[in-house]
Amino acid sequence: MLLAPGDVIKRSSEELKQRQIQINLVDWTESEGGKENKTEPKEESKAEGSKDGEGTQSESGQKEEGGKETKDADVDRRIHTAVGSGSSTKGPGERANENADRGDGKVGGGGGDADAGVGATGTNGRRWVVLTEEIARAIESKYGTKIDVYRDEVPAQIIEVERSLQKELGISREGVAEQTERSRDLRRKEKNGTHAKAVERGGRKQRKESHGDAQREGVEEEKTSEEPARIGITIEGVMSQNKLLSMIGGVERKMAPIGARESAVMLVSNSIKDVVRATAYFTAPTGDPHWKEVAREASKKKNILAYTSTGGDAKTEFLHLIDHL
């Protein structure tokens, strides 16, 4: 039997049912002012909202969740950051659902074809890239789409994975820090005009070589003066899985569930009453106010196995532990 924080168990309830593992979940949210509904899966709230057009029959907690989801979606659509004077880009996330349903391999906003699931095409036929190797590996592992890492090329269209999606992909703290550092460095360079100056130097050299034709030189000078306004780096903040998939293509890979017969875990619980018969416990940052007491009592037991989150996504680590016990 495995002890774990209540919110981690609740987030993993569907996967635990697939594994035929029993759940003993002590509800801690009633005393917290009815916050229980905030942890309900988004899919359920969304489905109920679509069945009840007016939404008056939904519980207040589900209304809050629906509002939160809409707010997240709006923020996701707005969070487009064009650094410097890069080319204008329409947020691909605005047509995420349409592109996902269409299934023709075209990426929203780009108008290009994904090469058999390899790479990701953005606007103007250019490809989306990410800032770190860890993020590229996580995307390929989860969605089956190979995506390149930014190598200081200009122009470029960069996906910046934000907090909620970092957890979904299981990005480590080190990986998050590395992305933040690279993003800040790029913004600093673009603000100082590093990339624009490089373009202008190239234009001046070309004009010097063709100085014999005054008219041609004038046209070229006009063209070059406009070039820095068209060339730059676009950084697109991505919070949701749907938006990411609309940009890079691919689908989420579903891991084959491991049944209870293949796992040593038969029951998971957050109840202090189950400490007596527990054989292991998993601890992670949690919103379960009673978990601290449960973990303290569990740590007093002899011959109990203790596991701690490494700082990644607690749900992913919890299920990984269950599958390997």
Curated annotation (Swiss-Prot):
It catalyses: ATP + H2O = ADP + phosphate + H(+). ATP binds at residue 106. Keywords: ATP-binding, Capsid protein, Hydrolase, Inner capsid protein, Nucleotide-binding, Virion. It comes from the Viruses. Its EC number is 3.6.4.13. Pfam families: Orbi_VP6 (PF01516). Belongs to the orbivirus VP6 family. Homohexamer. ATP dependent RNA helicase essential for RNA packaging and viral transcription. Possesses ss- and dsRNA-binding capacity. This is Helicase VP6-A. The gene is Segment-9.
